Amino acid sequence: MILLDYSAVAIASMMISLKLEGEKLTDFFALHMILNSIRTSNKRFKREFGKMVICCDHERNWRKESFQYYKYKRNKDKKNSDVDWNLIYKCLDFVQDEIDKGFPYLVVEVPNAEADDIIGALGTYATEIKEPTVIVSNDKDFVQLHSEYVCQYRPCESAFTRHPNPKLHLKELILRGDGDDGIPNIKTADDHFTIEGKRQKSMYQKDLDVWLYDDELSFLTDETKENYYRNERLIDLSFTPEDIRSEAVVKYKICKVRPNKPKMTQFFMKNKLRNLHEKINDFM
């Protein structure tokens, strides 16, 4: 299967075109970039990996409810940005709805879940049933899912990746935290990224070289123990609530794809996407 990190991949391609190619953000541009990112992935991977699953974010997510500072800085930066994020999200929702009506892909969205949770559940399931699978995403968090059957394609690098030791990589992520998601390293307090210009407490490579291989976690102090478990809960995809994981797999199993080429044509023509309609077979 092809697991597409829907909004993240589409937004990344938009940002590249906006910054490097000087494109102007309009409804037409956003629709084109969203659909073209889907078309490109489908054309590139369908023969080897089969059907595509569009993995979507729900408007609410359990991590934000569990950790109030989750993606705090990212959300703040968006509010202060010149980019019309409302337009982007409106177009993402619109395309998601249209895909469900006639495009030949599975759309999986689960209440209170991010696309990460869906990819985590289906990536784990793919390894269990030994189904060759590619995760299309730039996100380093998905390295933990790599296996004999699951690899990752990073569009930003135009390259496949399969980490030789996903568990070790995951542990390093937990120790270092994830600044992009507002998760500090294990030496740093929860609210660190809410304070402009403040530096995290240093993580020294000589310590990491020891800690990574300490399965007993004996290096944890009272100060860092709670922070380690905080990061583990937010980064390790096996900590996704079981009801979300189960629902994602069930939706994958029961979802029926009903491609409807006439409806796809109607959609392209109505939205003046003639250039994509000329490549309609790439979507099939």
Residue ranges and their predicted role:
Residues L20, E48-F49, K76-F267, N271-F283:
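Extended two-metal-dependent nuclease catalytic cores across DNA- and RNA-processing enzymes
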Residues M1-D97:
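Domain-level signal for Mg2+-assisted phosphodiester chemistry and nucleotide/NA-binding surfaces
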